[in-house]
Amino acid sequence: MFTVVSKNTGEISTTLDFHIRDELERKFRAAGMRGELLCIKCRQVVILHRSNEVCPHFFHQQDSTCPEANLSLHHLETRAALYSHLRREFHGDVYMEHNLSHSAVPRSVDCWVEHKGNTFAYWIFDKDIKNDLQRAVLRNALTRNNVQCHFVFTSRMLKTLGSGEGVVQPSGTEKFAKLCTPFDVLNEKKEGGSLQYIGIEEQRTVLISYRCLIGDSGSKTFSGVRKKTALADAEICSHTGFLIHPEEKRYTEILRTRQNRERLSEVSKPDDPQVLKW
């Protein structure tokens, strides 16, 4: 994890907000050795850990049962990349490892945004949750109080079928998380749902989205349209929190304009007795 609470002051700090390594070391190294840094979730003592594989993060003591202590490096690097990307759009309105006091939420929410009256929760999956009820209860807890929840998967969960880039073999959690978005219904196919993944390819972080995925809960495969973009180039909808590819912004604007014209055309038909005359 990247966020800690100061035992002495209650201050919450995130390593990713420090861009100079020496400043980060001065802030956390000695304090961790003195037992002054606490986990945001379990309030156990943590220390700063430096790794060549992922950004500096905090490490629990051995044999900790805290769920934050058992996250994979894949999960941590995805969390770090997503947080950094969200900060470009929402700046100080983004919170990493947000702690929700709800028994159905086993760990911190990876990224939390409160922006202009809207609240977005980003929850990363790095492994399958087998229990159907557990998945449903988690979603209900994350979407309370009109929170818009976005599920994101690490790329190692993505299983494609053969050479067909648009065909995936989803886990139970991926089937559960498939969501119908405006970028599915505004597509030419006008059906299906979306799944999104973040991963590292050729030393760059990428966003992979599957749009218009067709397949019910009993299907072994889903088929749809695959899109891939460097995460740094991905757009963010400021009112919904959706992660979108650059070409989707223009495409959806065109389709919305077209649909608005069609609605106006339907409304203005003179032989419809319920239509207002403009």
Predicted regions and their residues:
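Short beta-alpha junction loops
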Residues: F153-K159
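A short acidic, often aromatic-flanked loop/helix-cap motif at beta-alpha or helix-coil junctions
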Residues: I12, S101-A104, L158
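Mg2+/Mn2+-dependent nuclease catalytic core
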Residues: D126-F153
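Active-site metal-binding core of divalent-cation-utilizing nuclease and nuclease-like domains
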Residues: K27-A31, H85-W123, I129-K130, Q134
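Non-catalytic C-terminal interaction segments of nucleic acid-processing enzymes
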Residues: F2, S13, L161-W278
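N-terminal cysteine/histidine-rich coordination modules
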Residues: M1-A81
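Hydrophobic, Leu/Ile/Phe/Ala-enriched alpha-helical segments that form helix-helix packing faces
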Residues: V46, L82-F90, L142
